[in-house]
Curated annotation (Swiss-Prot):
Cysteine pairs bridged by disulfides in the record: none
Organism superkingdom: Bacteria
Induction: Repressed by FadR in the absence of LCFAs (fatty acids of 14-20 carbon atoms). When LCFAs are present in the medium, they are converted to long-chain acyl-CoAs, which antagonize FadR as to its binding to fadR boxes on target DNA and thus derepress transcription.
Name of one Pfam family that matches: Thiolase_N
Claim: Zinc-finger is one of the keywords in the record: no
UniProt keywords, alphabetically: Acyltransferase, Fatty acid metabolism, Lipid degradation, Lipid metabolism, Transferase
One GO biological process term: phenylacetate catabolic process
Entry GO MF terms: acetyl-CoA C-acyltransferase activity
Gene of this entry: fadA
Lineage: Bacteria, Bacillati, Bacillota, Bacilli, Bacillales
Protein task: Involved in the degradation of long-chain fatty acids.
Family label: Belongs to the thiolase-like superfamily. Thiolase family.
PROSITE patterns listed in its UniProt record: THIOLASE_1, THIOLASE_2, THIOLASE_3
Protein name: 3-ketoacyl-CoA thiolase
Length: 391
């Protein structure tokens, strides 16, 4: 079987949804910026691309009409490069990488670009219009339970306290703030030139330009005392708050995958090798524990044990679920989200899987860690995990 390797990649900084720096920027434009930069970082690659695979959790409105195809056009790819938008909710950006890698491993592709794009400013998490199947809603309402309420269910079922959740959130912000101060994300980020329209002093519209180059959700001054003052967000007597939950965000990311032999022939140094990907199902009402099912499956496919993994990028949808995943699998917390997670850095849904993969790659290189895992829970009661090996 052929080897699938990642040879380049780039992501935008993550913006806060609604009022952040990317709120007015279309998600397909963000995706195109990342695709162009990914090609540039692959030595200005102009050869064959078998497919463009883009993950998106809410593929409608600005993210509809097979957004991946539009991203390819905006990025200047020839019309001969096909494209597909994939949706497995929060794992979409990792699913896109897996689809591309598995095609390469089978010999069906030799080169593909995978990624994810999401604007939670322009397309809300549940979409503009939600129409549940009434029969399913009556028979199994947990399939329509809000993500926040599932986080509360995890906290109650597994005894994850408010204090533990807040402490985990503080750690996320502290690690992210330290990483930002040390410039750890600079190599994975492509700055975005943003144009906004404002009303000038003469009361007429005027355009304003700025360059957005750094994740903007991190709050370095966050403390447990500050977080303890926040009210529960989903249940009157609950423990899940805005402070110990992931932020709604905007962003995009992309990576180029290649057959190892082709990369070597072109003189492109592989960053990591794709080892495996797995998904698993769990009760929808505790969807946050999804990685508990997915990680062991992915490790088995890769022929590895938990102790072989040096770094984990575990999406922090909510502190309650991230804590329970770590506890149940017995993961060393010092290996998890060493540069912060979604509570501090944001969670742009369909982009997240690719974003986390890029962050993992760069930290694996810095630490010379052989194996790393990207994992997340998925709305509806699932988990996903991908295993990567440093080249």
């Amino acid at each position: 079987m052929k080897e699938a390797v990642i040879v380049s990649g780039a992501r935008t900084p993550v913006g806060k949804a609604k009022k952040g720096s990317l709120a007015t920027v279309r998600p397909d434009d963000l995706g195109a910026i990342c695709v162009k930069e990914t090609l540039k970082r692959a030595g200005g690659y102009e050869g064959n691309i078998d497919d463009l695979i883009i993950g998106c959790a809410t593929p409608e409105a600005e993210q509809g009409l097979n957004m991946a195809r539009n991203i390819g056009a905006l990025a200047g790819l020839p019309y001969t490069v096909p494209a597909i938008t994939v949706n497995r909710y929060c794992s979409s950006g990792l699913q896109s990488i897996a689809y591309a890698a598995e095609k390469i491993m089978l010999g069906a592709y030799d080169t593909a670009i995978a990624g994810g794009a999401e604007s939670m400013s322009q397309v809300p998490m549940m979409g503009h219009v939600t129409r549940p199947n009434l029969a399913l809603a009556e028979k199994a309402p947990e399939y329509y339970m809000s993500m926040g309420h599932t986080a509360e269910q995890v906290a109650k079922k597994y005894g994850v306290s408010r204090e533990d959740q807040d402490a985990f959130a503080v750690r996320s912000h502290q690690n992210a703030a330290k990483a930002l101060a040390e410039g750890k994300f600079k190599d994975e980020i492509v700055p975005v030139e943003v144009t906004v329209t404002e009303i000038g002093e003469d009361h007429k519209p005027m355009e304003k330009q700025f360059v957005f180059s750094q994740d903007e959700g991190v709050r370095p001054q966050t403390t447990a005392d500050i977080l303890s003052t926040l009210r529960p967000a989903f249940s009157v007597d609950g423990t899940v708050t805005a402070g110990n939950s992931s932020q709604t965000s905007d962003g995009a990311a992309a990576v180029m995958l290649m057959d190892r032999e082709k990369a070597d022939a072109l003189g492109l140094a592989p960053l990591v090798k794709f080892r495996s990907f797995a998904v698993g199902g769990v009760p929808p009402e505790v969807m946050g524990i999804g990685p508990v099912e997915a990680i062991p499956r992915a490790l088995k496919l890769a022929g590895l044990q938990l102790q072989d993994i040096g770094l984990f990028e575990l999406n922090e949808a909510f502190a309650s679920q991230a804590i329970q995943v770590i506890r149940e699998l017995g993961i060393d917390e010092e290996k998890v989200n060493v540069n912060g997670g979604a509570i501090a850095l944001g969670h742009p849904l369909g982009c997240t899987g690719t974003k986390l993969t890029l962050s993992l790659i760069h930290e694996m290189k810095r630490r010379n860690e052989q194996f790393g895992v990207v994992t997340m829970c998925i709305g509806g009661g699932m988990g996903a995990a991908g295993v990567f090996e440093l080249c």
